[in-house]
Amino acid sequence: MTDWKKRWRPPVDKALNYLSLARKAGKLELGEEPVGSAARAQHARLVVVAKDASDHTWRRAKSFVAGTAQECVRLPHSKDQLGAAVGRQEVAILALTDPAMALAFLKALPQPEQYADAMAALDKRSQRIAQRRREEKAHQRNKKMGKK
């Protein structure tokens, strides 16, 4: 058997890998109640709904983010695929709480141009957070060393 046949693996969806990483990092809320509480607390950056989730779930997800700066998208993945990515049976709704992770997730989806509005909003938010981190780091350095 040739080497490439031994090393061949089925294609992996990078977007689902980002969900797995977010779960391990603690930046993911799974299920309707945790997503709702994260959205009400303004912690959810991106609310994600599976393609085969019920219309009621989709309406609830949209109502969670209505009037806020949070984004809501419907994915081309099924509940089973989302569940397998995060280590559950099925997941119909989830929320990413980290804007950089949410942006990387949207960019990894097939046909990311579909989610251009959400990507622009998340990009703006992640840039603002990075700027605040740089300013805080400079402030701490100035407190310690004196302003130059």
Where do the protein language model's features map onto the residues?
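Charge-patterned, long linear interaction tracts outside catalytic cores
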Residues: 122-148
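Gly/Ser/Thr-rich loops at beta-strand to alpha-helix junctions
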Residues: 52-55, 101
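C-terminal structural segments of small proteins and small subunits
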Residues: 88-124
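Mid-chain, well-packed structural core segment of small domains
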Residues: 68-98
